């Protein structure tokens, strides 16, 4: 079937290889370097020039006013301008912190102050690397395939599984079996490390290959490497067993391989149609970009500019010869995907990212499962830093090394985040001055640094990460990732690959006190700190000291807001729907037993049922057996169902027993539609400061309310903490 590519492809005359597109520049190289040098010298001058409080406030105020004035203008130049102003203000702050605020004080002041300065330097480096990473996102578009299908390469599709239930794997396999690709050039393989007879029988019924091995060495990476030896396709497409591909996946992905012989990897987004724990427990699904959207919506496009696209383990196609050249999927770390991309790039291969969602999967169901997944990612990036550090060795350009450095450093935010959550308590409890400066001077330097950086990120990240939500995500995960990352740095061989649980249910709402325990402790410390601060305010005289008290009280209050949102995330809401509903608006036909034919449109669907809106509402009795007509490639097929509910013309139906071909048809006409996820990808409104602030405050208030309810329940029934999934320490 011919493919209509979701994004307009470039005309043939304008096709450029990935390499030439990355290096394209309107300025000669010498002139570019001259401009960079001039900018660096100007920045050094701006950073180092001494200013008093008034001059500093005027300088930073002017830059902030300019940024406010231009922030809504279009064009990349505006973003580069805002980044430059943000760096100027932030560099002034860091320079001031290092040269003016680490003066003589007590040993305790100096040690605690050094810890805070270290956390701030870490945040500054991440800010600079983040700006570099998204300096000029490539925004690559799909390239059409040749009209002659004989020129299309052969592809092996791998779906690795271990302990996931067949109900999760089933839809992915059926979707893979209807991918639009010449029949003689595609082979589907289910790689079952669970060695289950039920899966073997299912594969035989569907007509795909069932592949297993005698051991589970190296987990998912070993599973894929073992399967590589049993097949011979030119390329390998890999899907996690819950990632359902669309029919057009390969036609969107493969064009670039035929236009660039050095291209080894095409990665596409991981889109999740079910809410993750943050979205479900904070009721932000569809309202706030989830934790992963920044990476797949912006950072990977930025990486692509520098030929530093990461392989993400699923929704990707890899060139077989390139993969075999680097020894298969990397097995030395628990983030085998990112490490494999690094090995390919070291060998001079190019990698590409297409921000076109052509597969969708299930998000983690519980906060504890989500945390366990992030622990593995954090440990794996720390292992890469030790075992195959991108800053060292041959084969990478400086730009690639910087992208990997940002990715590795990102997962070390645990310690800095905990420092931020406790730093004001040093003064409120003990009177320690961690910053040797007046509150006014701190505000004059720190506030512009924070405001300018947030305003810039508001412009750059707006559709993919709303303001302050990064604080909530990092606060929630900080306690759990700082130890694995530090341990992996010391001994990268410790730890194991843990499979992320998918397809589970939350039978009843409950408060996961086990996962929230560190944050309950931190919240208690901050509450006591607030009390101590108020007492200091009452009993300590002197306007200078009062300013310092107010500054630390405000900081502590902000920390309490973040901790409240974190605690709300640990309050698991009930999730009893095993098959998640997906919005879909397409024509369908409802056939009644008496012969009536009712034209309708779908509202949403799942593997178990569908909601439809009748064109002409009429009462339909619940329990009535019906047939639902769904079209695929212009042909309609009916599927058996029963009416469950009729609400003013919106009818809910439940599918009944279907044949394998009917089930395959259902998947092909719903989950596997080429455009099914496009309307839901990157469609969030641009962020607004007050809206984000209100959402975070609402989440925090919900957390305090749920904590209060949990305390009351515990007092009545006795405290019995629950944990949904054991965490790997």
From Swiss-Prot:
Domain PilZ: 575-671
Chain positions covered by the region annotation Catalytic subdomain B: 321-381
Primary location class: membrane
EC numbers, comma separated: 2.4.1.12
Annotated active site: 193, 337
Membrane topology: Multi-pass membrane protein
Cofactor(s) required, per the database record: Mg(2+)
Bilayer-spanning residue ranges: 30-50, 110-130, 171-191, 405-425, 427-447, 520-540, 549-569, 610-630
InterPro entries per record: Cell_synth_A, Cellulose_synth, Glyco_trans_2-like, Glycosyltr_2/OpgH_subfam, Nucleotide-diphossugar_trans, PilZ_domain
Domain of life: Bacteria
Pathway it works in: Glycan metabolism; bacterial cellulose biosynthesis
Activity regulation, per record: Activated by bis-(3'-5') cyclic diguanylic acid (c-di-GMP).
Transmembrane is among the record's keywords: yes
Annotated region described as Catalytic subdomain A, given as residue ranges: 151-244
CDD domains: CESA_CelA_like
Similarity comment text for this entry: Belongs to the glycosyltransferase 2 family.
Function, as annotated: Catalytic subunit of cellulose synthase. It polymerizes uridine 5'-diphosphate glucose to cellulose, which is produced as an extracellular component for mechanical and chemical protection.
Name of the protein in question: Cellulose synthase catalytic subunit [UDP-forming]
Annotated source species: Xanthomonas axonopodis pv. citri (strain 306)
């Amino acid at each position: 079937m011919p493919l209509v590519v979701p994004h307009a492809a470039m005309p043939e005359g304008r096709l450029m290889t990935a390499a030439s597109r990355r290096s394209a520049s309107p300025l000669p190289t010498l002139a570019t370097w001259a401009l960079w040098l001039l900018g660096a010298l100007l920045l050094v001058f701006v950073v180092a020039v001494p200013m008093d409080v008034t001059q500093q406030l005027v300088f930073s105020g002017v830059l902030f006013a300019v940024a406010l004035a231009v922030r809504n203008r279009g064009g990349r130049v505006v973003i580069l301008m805002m980044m430059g102003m943000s760096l100027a203000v932030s560099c002034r702050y860091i320079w001031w912190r290092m040269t003016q605020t680490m003066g003589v004080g007590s040993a305790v002041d100096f040690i605690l102050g050094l810890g805070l300065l270290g956390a701030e330097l870490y945040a500054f480096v991440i800010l600079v690397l983040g700006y570099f990473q998204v300096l000029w996102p490539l925004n690559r578009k799909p390239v059409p395939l040749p009209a002659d299908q004989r020129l299309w390469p052969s592809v092996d599709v791998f779906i690795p599984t271990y302990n996931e239930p067949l109900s999760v794997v089933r839809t992915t396999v059926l979707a893979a079996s209807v991918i639009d690709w010449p029949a003689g050039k595609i082979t589907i393989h289910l790689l079952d490390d669970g060695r289950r007879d039920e899966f073997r029988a299912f594969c035989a019924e569907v007509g795909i290959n069932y592949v297993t091995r005698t051991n589970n060495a190296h987990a998912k990476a070993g599973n894929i490497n073992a399967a590589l030896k049993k097949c011979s396709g030119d390329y390998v497409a890999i899907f996690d067993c819950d990632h359902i591909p669309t029919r057009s996946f390969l036609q969107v992905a493969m064009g670039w391989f035929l236009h660039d012989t050095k291209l080894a990897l095409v990665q596409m987004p991981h889109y999740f149609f079910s809410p993750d724990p943050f979205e479900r427990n904070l009721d932000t699904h569809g309202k706030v970009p989830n934790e992963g959207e920044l990476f797949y919506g912006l950072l990977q496009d930025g990486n692509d500019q520098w030929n530093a696209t990461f392989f993400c383990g699923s929704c990707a196609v890899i060139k077989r010869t390139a993969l075999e050249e680097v020894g298969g999927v990397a097995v030395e770390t628990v983030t085998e995907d990112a490490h494999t991309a690094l090995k390919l790039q070291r060998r001079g291969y190019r990698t590409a990212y297409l921000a076109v969602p052509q597969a969708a999967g299930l998000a983690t169901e519980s906060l504890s499962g989500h945390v366990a997944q992030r622990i593995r990612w954090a440990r794996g990036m720390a292992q890469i830093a030790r075992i195959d550090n991108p800053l060292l060795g041959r084969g990478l350009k400086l730009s690639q090394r910087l992208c990997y450095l940002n990715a590795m450093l990102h997962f070390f935010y645990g310690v800095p985040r905990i420092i931020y959550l406790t730093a004001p308590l040093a003064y409120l409890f003990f009177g320690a001055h961690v910053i040797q400066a007046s509150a006014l001077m701190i505000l004059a330097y720190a506030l512009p640094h924070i405001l300018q950086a947030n305003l810039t990120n508001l412009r750059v990240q707006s559709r993919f990460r709303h303001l302050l939500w990064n604080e909530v995500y990092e606060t929630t995960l900080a306690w759990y990732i700082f130890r694995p990352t530090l341990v992996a740095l010391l001994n990268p061989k410790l730890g194991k690959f843990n499979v992320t649980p998918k397809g589970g249910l939350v039978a009843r709402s409950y408060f996961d006190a086990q996962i929230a325990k560190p944050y309950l402790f931190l919240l208690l410390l901050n509450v006591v700190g607030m009390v101590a601060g108020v007492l200091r305010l009452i009993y300590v005289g002197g306007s200078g000291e009062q300013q310092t008290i107010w500054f630390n009280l405000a900081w502590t209050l902000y920390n309490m807001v973040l901790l409240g949102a974190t605690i709300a995330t640990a309050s698991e809401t009930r999730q009893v729907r095993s098959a998640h509903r997906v919005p879909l608006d397409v024509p369908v036909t409802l056939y009644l037993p008496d012969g009536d034919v009712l034209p309708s449109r779908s509202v949403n669907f799942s593997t178990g049922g569908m909601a439809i809106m009748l064109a002409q509402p009429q009462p339909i009795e619940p329990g009535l057996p019906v047939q639902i007509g769904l079209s695929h490639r212009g042909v309609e097929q009916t599927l058996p169902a029963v009416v469950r509910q009729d609400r003013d013309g919106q009818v809910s139906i439940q599918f009944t027993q279907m044949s394998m071909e009917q089930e395959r048809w259902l998947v092909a006409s719903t989950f596997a539609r080429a455009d099914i996820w496009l309307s839901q990808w990157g469609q969030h409104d641009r962020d607004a400061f007050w809206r984000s602030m209100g959402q975070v405050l609402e989440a925090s208030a919900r957390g305090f309310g749920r904590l209060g309810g949990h305390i009351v329940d515990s007092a009545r029934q006795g405290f019995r903490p629950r944990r949904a999934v054991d965490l790997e320490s």
